[in-house]
């Protein structure tokens, strides 16, 4: 296993303030509901081979909420959404990292939580917001790619199971 900074295994883009967006852009903004929709998406996600603009999400990109961090792999349902100030777009280099493994690692790994806690030291607010520099330098532990794919698929199956269980209880 090796450890890499996020900037070494993925491209990162950051959104703009919604007050600087056109009305049309504001209507198609990626938000918390989009994130939930992607985390609960049951269909297959096929990473886009297109190179999109840094300001929009493609299927297979990761959306990372910067306030109280949470990540999701972007589905076809929310692909094309506009990147806002509250999210980062992460385009994984798929020769180095599996998107579902990276989603798992960002959401669940204790190591990430410790890095976030350390970065938040000295902040007055209890709301944690990730900065661009911190995010680029975030350390990610990488098993070999086959193991990443295996762990990523287990995480994806767990998300599907959790969503189906929640739906059954409603």
Give residue ranges: language-model regions:
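Non-catalytic DNA-recognition/assembly elements of restriction-modification systems
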Residues: 1-28, 35-39, 142-170
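Short Ser/Thr-interspersed hydrophobic loop/turn segments at strand-loop and sheet-helix junctions
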Residues: 6-16, 32-37, 55-73, 105-117, ...
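Short, surface-exposed beta-edge/turn micro-motifs
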Residues: 27, 59-62, 85-87
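Short, well-ordered beta-strand micro-motif
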Residues: 31, 89-91, 139
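Short, structured beta-strand/loop micro-motifs enriched in basic residues and often containing a Trp
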Residues: 40-48
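Short, surface-exposed secondary-structure edge patches
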Residues: 51-56, 78-79
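A short beta-sheet element
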Residues: 67-108
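A short glycine-rich beta-alpha junction/loop motif
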Residues: 81-87, 122-149
């Amino acid at each position: 296993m090796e450890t890499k900074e996020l900037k070494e295994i993925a491209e990162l883009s950051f959104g703009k303030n919604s007050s600087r967006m056109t009305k049309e852009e504001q209507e198609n903004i990626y938000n918390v509901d989009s994130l939930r929709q992607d985390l609960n998406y049951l269909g297959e996600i096929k990473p886009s081979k297109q190179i999109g603009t840094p300001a929009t999400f493609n299927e297979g990109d990761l959306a990372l909420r910067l306030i109280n961090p949470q990540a999701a792999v972007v589905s076809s349902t929310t692909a094309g959404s506009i990147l806002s100030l509250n999210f980062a777009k992460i385009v994984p280099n798929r020769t180095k990292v599996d998107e579902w493994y990276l989603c798992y690692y960002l959401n669940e790994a204790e190591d990430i939580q410790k890095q976030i806690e350390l970065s938040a030291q000295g902040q007055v607010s209890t709301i944690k917001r990730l900065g661009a520099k911190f995010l680029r330098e975030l350390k990610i532990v990488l098993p070999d790619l086959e193991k990443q794919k295996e762990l990523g698929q287990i995480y994806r199956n767990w998300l599907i199971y959790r969503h189906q269980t929640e739906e059954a209880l409603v």
